[in-house]
């Protein structure tokens, strides 16, 4: 047993080190940037060290557990622990946040506050993925919202206040249901609240009550994931946010919803999940088609990419609803895969906006001639997004397909129907993704304009793009990198279900 508090250090380090930023000189933008990047790198190295030397892959139980009494009156503990399901998102968080701080290099206005908020988000995200206490999970979930709201409302585009208000209304509204579910589960059947994940997993509830809890949690995760029809905050938020914030939103924030769906709804409420799972699959299928057919109608480049995120999260929801080994593993792989691809697309959209100052696709055109590096990277990630074989998106979607087809829970006709509709969604994906590339990069519109000389991406931007591209290719060629983390845990979760 390892008694060193690794997880506490990993969760607390970014926000506590971030609070020291305010002691740095106000005008020292360079010092602030380097300090933030060093903190992020140190955190990423810590996570990697703990993963390599203190984490056993073949053990589906909770590892590196820490349990400290916090508030005695209602038995509230600082309880952390990781398993195969949470290690993937934690590594993804470390990786994407480090690159997002590097992407935020051009920001000079109020840079102390900006970098502090990014580090506060970092703590909230890792805390959510590693907490083993329902109330602690809720607190970490909420810790995420305030930094995002401020990052949106202070460093966003023209309609930033509208989109920030919409974001906070949606997510805070969803969090009310999360809090009600957490308190309901904690207080059920005893005078003393039991907020421990392990105790809650062994607790049995009346079916009606379990369905109510499940539905409450589902609303909270549906806002965050997002699941239609609670997705409308996402395109507005992505359309206005600075691209480094978009990287964190698309890469990590949306994954917290899918993670919560597996961690709480599947693990703690298995009966309700087997009732709701057909509906999840139907909604996921509608979501893929709806978002893929809405996306081509968007003029705003970032909104178009945001709708592609909604479409890709549909695969995760279908995988979670299939209740099979392959389906759930595919969903976990899609979470990681889309974390990389979504973050990269928003980063490249933002860097091209920095140069041409245009956000509407019908005003762009001909950028490829003057910016070949951005063109190459954007095209590569568009291919990854439309699930080109050899890239991570293809493997994830293929495994989800396999999960549906092998699911014994559903009859043959519904399975064929869902697979057919998903296939239509996969055909629509290249349509919006390739037309987006065509409108941006081909033609002569900007090339013929006066002062049409634009700078191509510099070493910093190339480094960020290539750093994200390598794992996308790596997972596409050898998906066991990610699957080996979660495969034992997925089996342990599915052992609660009658269907296998």
From Swiss-Prot:
This is NAD(P)H-quinone oxidoreductase chain 4, chloroplastic. It is a multi-pass membrane protein. Keywords: Chloroplast, Membrane, NAD, NADP, Plastid, Plastoquinone, Quinone, Thylakoid, Translocase, Transmembrane, Transmembrane helix. The chain crosses the membrane at residues 3-23, 37-57, 87-107, 113-130, 134-154, 167-187, 208-228, 242-262, 272-292, 305-325, 330-350, 386-406, 416-436, 462-482. One of its GO terms (cellular component) is chloroplast thylakoid membrane. The gene is ndhD. GO terms for molecular function: NADH dehydrogenase (ubiquinone) activity; ubiquinone binding. Its main location: plastid. The lineage of its organism: Eukaryota, Viridiplantae, Streptophyta, Embryophyta, Tracheophyta. Belongs to the complex I subunit 4 family. HAMAP family: NDH1_NuoM (MF_00491). Its EC number is 7.1.1.-. GO terms for biological process: ATP synthesis coupled electron transport; electron transport coupled proton transport. It is found in: Plastid, Chloroplast thylakoid membrane. It catalyses: a plastoquinone + NADH + (n+1) H(+)(in) = a plastoquinol + NAD(+) + n H(+)(out); a plastoquinone + NADPH + (n+1) H(+)(in) = a plastoquinol + NADP(+) + n H(+)(out).
